[in-house]
């Protein structure tokens, strides 16, 4: 049978924001410039098709974009979006050379895009936090300055889910070409929970779809300010799988990682446990605050032994901003329903681990079983602020605890009576950066393979590619390996595709198999 040529389908919008690599040494101007060759190599390795180029970290970023990065990205087949910071982020450092003159920025970027067709548009960070500056009238001037030079120049504001509503869109609809929505759990600002990601993406999609606006979902691959730690590899994995499902269903038109690190070394500032790598954390993010009486807790059932003498030594710490008042939050330890220890969150220095020893004999004598609970409780006040506390290295006498050192997530249950109190065993991962990189590479290349086969492969292969994607989205690693093996065998036996196409897809399958072997 004669092999038919198939046109290449348009690449899916799989992107990355910032996380740029810098040259190891400064140039003659004293600045470490963007390391374009290494950055392009990493983006290609990841399978990135769209890169949000942040102009902020160095005064030479604009010139590096114009003279080095854009031509290299064009040759590599990568589309570029200039990412600008708003006035709220420009108090100390501005985007050079035009600062907060965004009319000048749009004019300059529009002119540059006439020379580089892969320069697609502009993304404005934290747009909804700067509406007093970005009035519809001013945004119209920005847009006009760019469109006058290049009518195809696009503007996608970066907006959070909580600001996406019909009244807002009614004012700005004619000024947007699409929206970038960064997921951080809505009003409960964190990078620990993903349970509402797909619901928020679906609702935002329906709202924007009525206006004819595409939605790009951005998920955190690195630290969000005022949170306990970087998002775990597991969090990034869940976020990307949810994003791929939304992309597959057509609810979003693109998926982007927020600051995916491309150099891999331990993030030692995240190693905050008293001993080892893990500790029990209770976190209240900035946003809607718990009311007095609201709480989160870490609990374990215990069975006191027959010794008749019971003690507990434990370690605890607090992290909070300066505006937290004394008396608003307390840490507690309970036996059953009785509070046996309490201390104000502000007692002691920030991040300082303190040791406490309690005599629990009066509370445990004669009991066959009960519970040990550590709590974070709001006592009074209503001011919104973020904070978190930690417990670690519990040394019991007269009873046993499972994973008293919090080096494993099991053994402890986390509960709260308010969604703004988030509990989790946080375990420092010295290989987090590499693991997140490999997870992203696997996800992106899987979707590329699925997209290419579903667009131009014969029906039997399309079904197998869809099965492979569903296994990835479902987190079923063993099924993915099996699906890849079956797909490879089917390709080797196929006689309807050009040999070059078969070889390309087989090479992609082999690459995915290697990634899964390294980071299962």
Which residues does each PLM region occupy?
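Extracellular carbohydrate recognition and processing domains
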Residues: 335-368, 379-382, 410-412, 424
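Short beta-strands within extracellular/lumenal beta-sheet-rich domains
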Residues: 284-308, 353-357
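Soluble extracellular-acting proteins and domains
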Residues: 450-520
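Extended, low-complexity, turn-rich repeat/linker tracts enriched in Gly/Pro/Ser/Thr and Asp/Glu
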Residues: 291, 305-307, 317-328, 379-383
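Extracellular carbohydrate recognition
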Residues: 293-295, 326, 378-400, 429-432
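Glycan-processing catalytic domains of CAZymes
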Residues: 2-269, 418-455
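Extracellular beta-strand-rich recognition modules
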Residues: 310-318, 368-378, 392, 406
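Short carbohydrate-recognition loop motifs
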Residues: 269-295, 422-429
């Amino acid at each position: 049978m004669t092999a038919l040529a198939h046109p290449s389908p348009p690449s899916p919008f799989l992107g990355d924001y910032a996380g740029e690599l810098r040259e190891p040494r400064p140039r003659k101007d004293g600045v470490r410039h963007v390391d374009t060759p290494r950055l392009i190599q990493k983006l290609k390795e990841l399978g990135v098709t769209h890169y949000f180029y942040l102009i902020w970290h160095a005064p030479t970023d604009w010139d590096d974009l114009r003279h080095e990065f854009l031509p290299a990205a064009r040759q590599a087949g990568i589309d570029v979006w200039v990412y600008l910071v708003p006035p709220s982020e420009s108090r100390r450092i501005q985007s050079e050379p035009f600062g907060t003159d965004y009319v000048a920025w749009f004019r300059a970027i529009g002119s540059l895009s006439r020379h580089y067709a892969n320069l697609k548009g502009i993304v404005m960070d934290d747009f909804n936090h700067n509406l007093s500056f970005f009035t519809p009238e001013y945004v119209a001037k920005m847009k006009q300055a760019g469109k006058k030079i290049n009518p195809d120049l696009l503007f996608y504001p970066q907006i959070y889910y909580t600001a996406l509503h019909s009244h807002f869109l009614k004012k700005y609809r004619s000024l947007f070409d699409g929206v970038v929505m960064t997921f951080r759990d809505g009003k409960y600002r964190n990078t620990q929970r993903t349970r509402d990601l797909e619901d928020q993406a679906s609702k935002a999609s329906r709202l924007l779809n009525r206006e004819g606006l595409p939605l790009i979902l951005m998920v955190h691959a690195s630290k969000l300010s005022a949170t306990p730690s970087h998002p775990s590899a597991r969090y990034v994995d869940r976020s990307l799988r949810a994003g791929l499902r939304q992309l597959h269903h057509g609810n979003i038109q693109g998926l982007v990682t927020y600051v995916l690190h491309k150099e891999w070394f331990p993030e030692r500032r995240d190693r905050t446990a008293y001993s080892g790598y893990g500790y029990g954390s209770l976190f209240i993010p900035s946003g809607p605050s718990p009311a007095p009486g609201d709480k989160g807790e870490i609990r374990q059932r215990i069975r006191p032994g027959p010794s008749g003498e019971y003690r507990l030594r434990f370690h605890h710490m607090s992290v909070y901003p300066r505006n937290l008042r004394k008396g608003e939050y307390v840490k507690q330890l309970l036996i059953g329903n009785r509070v046996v220890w309490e201390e104000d969150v502000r007692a002691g220095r920030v991040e300082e681990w303190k040791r406490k020893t309690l005599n629990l004999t009066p509370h445990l004598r004669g009991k066959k079983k009960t519970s040990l609970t550590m709590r974070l409780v709001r006592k009074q006040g209503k001011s919104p602020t973020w904070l978190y506390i930690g417990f670690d290295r519990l040394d019991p006498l007269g009873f046993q605890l499972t994973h008293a050192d919090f080096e494993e997530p099991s053994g402890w249950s986390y509960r709260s009576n308010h969604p703004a109190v988030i509990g989790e065993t946080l375990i420092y991962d010295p290989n987090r950066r590499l693991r997140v990189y490999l997870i992203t590479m696997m996800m992106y290349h899987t979707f590329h393979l699925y997209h290419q086969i579903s667009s131009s492969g014969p029906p039997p292969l399309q079904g197998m590619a869809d099965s492979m994607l569903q296994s990835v989205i479902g987190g079923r690693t063993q099924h993915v390996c099996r699906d890849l093996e079956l797909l490879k065998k089917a390709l080797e036996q196929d006689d309807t595709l050009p040999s070059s196409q078969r070889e390309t897809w087989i090479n992609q399958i082999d690459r995915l198999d290697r990634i899964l072997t390294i980071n299962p």
